[in-house]
UniProtKB/Swiss-Prot annotation:
Any Pfam family: Coiled
Alphabetized InterPro entries for the sequence: HssA/B-related (IPR008455)
Region Disordered, annotated ranges: 11-34
Protein name: Putative uncharacterized protein DDB_G0283135
Length: 81
């Protein structure tokens, strides 16, 4: 279950890495760079989302490989019996 819990937590973390700019007036929250700063932040967060997705996919692959290994070991054991 620890792998499943890791996948769930990664998914929730990635959802927080979003930046929305409603209009020009909201750009002040990004400091002196204004909209340019907002675009940079959005790019950084988009990269974080991609990395989080890659991490989840890696965990899924690990879980799948582990499950397949367990099935193969079980099959080999039953054949020997």
């Amino acid at each position: 279950m620890s792998i499943f819990n890791s996948i769930v937590s990664l998914g929730s973390v990635s959802s927080s890495n979003k930046v929305s700019v409603a209009n020009g007036s909201s750009s002040s929250s990004f400091g002196s760079n204004g909209i340019s700063g907002a675009k940079t932040s959005a790019k950084v967060n988009a990269t974080a989302n991609v990395n989080a997705i890659a991490d989840v996919n890696a965990l899924l692959a690990t879980a799948t490989n582990a499950a397949n290994t367990n099935v193969n070991v079980a099959s080999a054991t039953s054949l020997k019996l």
